[in-house]
Amino acid sequence: MKYIGAHVSASGGVENAVLRAVEIGANAFALFTKNQRQWKALALKADTIEKFKRFCKAHQFSPEHILPHDSYLINLGNPEAENLAKSREAFIDEMERANQLGLKLLNFHPSAHLNKISESECLARIAESINIAVDKVPNVIAVIENTAGQGSNLGYRFEHLAEIIDQVEDKNRVGVCLDTCHLFSAGYDISSLESCEQTFSEFERTVGFQYLRGMHLNGSKTPLGSRVDRHHTLREGTIGTDFCKFIMQDDRFDNIPLILETIQPEIWTEEIKFLRTLAK
């Protein structure tokens, strides 16, 4: 079964994200559990946690189909010791918040080496950061998102993801989220059914579908291999819609959250319906 939703606002309390997902006809969703542009946040209140869990149960949202995203400030491979420690502390807090809400996943952008350390050193720091976090917080899987490869950001090659995973001690506590806009911008062609098969076969060989814990379904405003991250709606932009058909008709993408981060929230309901029409 396909679980489709969007990254909805948690404004006014994380429990409201559940209701906003219901409004757009979703059976999966993503959210921030705190302000994504601040390092610190007030602790989740007991009544907020209770409402979130109650609303999820009432509307049949399973923890496996909810994909919280961490703060954009966090850089788990930061070359500077002080900033690395700050990022690790913030990531552990994000994991604790997810665990408090009964969630099983935490999506994050891997890192940027800032041209101060090598790619391998940066990837090793990311893996070490995951090891530290999962040792401190139970239950939650660290879900690495592929990137478009802007600037010194890593994670734009499948090999980067594999190198991180290889150095994570508990393989049950690490996973991957593939963003279709990022894939295309990084040079992985998904503009036809044939190119999708080639790209996802390469993913299987390099990383493995057993690690795929979610996807972000986005169009792109930039051409193949641009290394620029600019999301578009599903049916506009440079990729086309064959990738949507491929994903919706392939059971390797069953039972994971398929999350829209497209640029017009007002058409998310329509985009979710469109995706469902493509299913077998």
Curated annotation (Swiss-Prot):
Enzyme Commission code: 3.1.21.2
Enzyme class (EC, first level): hydrolase
UniProt-annotated binding residues for Zn(2+) 1: 69, 109, 145
Residues the entry annotates as binding Zn(2+) 3: 182, 229, 231
Catalytic activity from the UniProt record: Endonucleolytic cleavage to 5'-phosphooligonucleotide end-products
InterPro entries the UniProt entry points to: AP_endonuc_2, AP_endonuc_F2_Zn_BS, Xyl_isomerase-like_sf, Xyl_isomerase-like_TIM-brl
GO biological process: base-excision repair
Function description: Endonuclease IV plays a role in DNA repair. It cleaves phosphodiester bonds at apurinic or apyrimidinic (AP) sites, generating a 3'-hydroxyl group and a 5'-terminal sugar phosphate.
Database matches in HAMAP family: Nfo
Designated name of the protein: Probable endonuclease 4
Protein species of origin: Actinobacillus pleuropneumoniae serotype 5b (strain L20)
